[in-house]
């Protein structure tokens, strides 16, 4: 395949805040994104551009009211309007040699509420609920013109989300700590699932479908400690069970053998930690030398439904624990910086969600200029 895909992206954001005294705040926000992809074949001396391009436009408008009667607590309610426009080619023959342009629009409404309460100084709790909509990504709708096959008819995910968080922060001289823990609940309809399909020539590609109902229950915990301006240590741990909540099989009245089982190809336990060292005014005032070590851990998971893979090691992606190191020198208070990074410096065997091995140890360099 010798082809070229040209993507055009643009987005616009507008936010208006209106304060009514010091207690009431009204916020109106609008986010508009537009994407267009033009494909061309380079197999001949003359570039042949597809007659039908692929296009999507997303518009999300939100209105929020926030009540802040004291410094101890606040309460917010909000509503959202989602609009999605998708257009692209659809084959009209089994040989897929003739296409017509098709398009459709979808509208959804969402709403929610959130509250924050400072129980004592430094101790804060947050509660939130949202009827949400997740619009599909570019890859889920159009693929990547290679090994990802999109579906322009895929529907957005719709879910009921609940979150409870508790956090604590404090400073003791040069020492500061931050702890946070939370519980997560989601009930998702039309869950967008990534599947692997077999292609000719022994090749495989990914496709996306809407799966009826998925339920997520989980928790997360994070901890961070800092000593002055020269040391920072932190870590996160998450367990997220994303389970099949369909009692019957899709498009059938037969019992679903995967009911209450974890969705395939999704890690459900993962963690990371990092250590950062800073040398301020290194060589010159305003310059900083920093050294960062970080790691990522993924617990083993199945790339078929868990009640199948749990008893067959061949269907399990093994535990993964990778280590990275980054050295950065920033100048003129961060205006210029040069970084050198070694990812997976212990050359661990790492895999994607379908047990395909990733590249090993890698080195990167980066120069950044902040205007």
List each language-model region with its residue ranges.
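Membrane-embedded beta-barrel scaffold of Gram-negative outer-membrane proteins
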Residues: 118, 124-130, 156-217, 238
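Outer-membrane beta-barrel translocator domains and adjoining extracellular loop/strand segments
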Residues: 1-2, 38-46, 87-96, 137-145, ...
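Short loop/turn motifs that connect adjacent beta-strands in outer-membrane beta-barrel proteins
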Residues: 19-25, 68-73, 120-122, 171-178, ...
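Gram-negative outer-membrane beta-barrel transporters
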Residues: 179, 184-187, 209-304
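Extracellular loop and loop/strand-boundary signature of outer-membrane beta-barrel proteins
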Residues: 1-3, 11, 44-52, 64, ...
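Surface-exposed extracellular loop regions of Gram-negative outer-membrane beta-barrel proteins
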Residues: 1, 25-42, 55-97, 106-112, ...
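Conserved C-terminal beta-signal and adjacent last beta-strands/turns
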Residues: 61, 65-66, 113-116, 127, ...
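Transmembrane beta-strands of outer-membrane beta-barrel pores
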Residues: 32-36, 67, 81-87, 129-135, ...
